[in-house]
Amino acid sequence: MMIGLYLFLNLAVLWIVARASAANGLRLALMLLLAGFVVGSANSLIEALFFHVLRARDLVAAALPAAIVFAVLAPIAVLIAGRWRRGAAASDAGRGGFTPLTLLGVIAAYELLYWSAGTLVFPYIAHFYEARSLPPVYEVAAVQIVRSLVFVGAVYPLLRNGLRSAPIVLALVYSIIGGVAPLLPDNPYMPPDIRFYHGIEVTVSNFIFGLVVGWLFAWRPRRPVAAQA
């Protein structure tokens, strides 16, 4: 049942992204595959490896099922969204972008959300990590810089090609594909109670992070209007 819900949630969000995107066809399917796999699996595996929840030799076995799932779901989402053939482009196609300042904002937002959510949930999951040697705080913070930029990179092609309502769409991508969905099925690495609390943690924080990323992509500082003589 949880596998079915996992597949349904991922397909539903990919369909929403496909409907909001200005791209179409195979190009759109590949962008959905990239976003789905990286957000829904690869970026989480980075942290699982870092916290010794997963061993390096288990990475391929852990990543392969998600790669297959998104390779199948991505073209299906494009097809049922009616975007396999050329359609109307999104009205905000090509607008927006990131600057060094906005990327710093992305990193700062992710760090703030990560540590805030983690601090609130840690008392409920501390027993799971007692037997593991946790890395120093500065190393954890450094890894989150990388992960925040990986999150952005995964959806950047979609943003550059035009994505209507980008903040809310990214909030759904990060919170469902990268939050609640992958924690639904049983897995040999994390027991149900730990997945439950982590699910609350990442779903809420990732939703807010998606709003921030979408807003910062479109944000431009206002230029002063020259006074007329």
Name what the model sees in each region.
Residues M1-A229:
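Juxtamembrane/disordered regions of integral membrane proteins
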